[in-house]
Amino acid sequence: MKKLFALALALCLLCGAALAEETPELNWSNIPEEVQANGALQQIAAPDLPVIVYWVPANMTAVDPSTVQADPAPAAVFMTEDGQYTISVFALNVTSLQEYLTALEGAGNKLNNVTINGIDCVSVEADAYEGVIVPMNDTLVLSFVCTPKDGDEDWDQVKGVIFSSIQVAQ
């Protein structure tokens, strides 16, 4: 009886561990059409790689990336009229994906695996921003960064829609 109980306990622990490591999924198809219609899909492309599209709300306009002082420079920037909320997209060449993620985590950022529209990604929660890293290959990542990290309740929902929209162009 003790062996049976021990086996049952071991199975419960294994199942619990497997469930705890389940990767969250975000899907554009789960976003209501009326929300999707309140913005537009933008795209970013890199040579020899698939085109990635992402949603930008109608209240944000494109900003010339060369006017943004950031190192590295972003590939695309969108901002509200008052400049309070921004979406920046960076195309980053990295030594390796694992080294890049290790460095981010070592800098105190919280990383979590997430699947977005079938793409294995990594969410990043930093002091000043929330973002998503989309690995294009082992040495190129797209980093979607939303600032500020903490805004009003609407901004939190908008960030969720932006991140849920990231997908390979059809």
Task: Give the positions of each predicted feature.
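Conserved polar/disulfide-associated segments of primarily extracytoplasmic proteins
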Residues: 65-152
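N-terminal targeting sequences that direct proteins away from the cytosol to non-cytosolic compartments
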Residues: 2, 6-73, 146-170
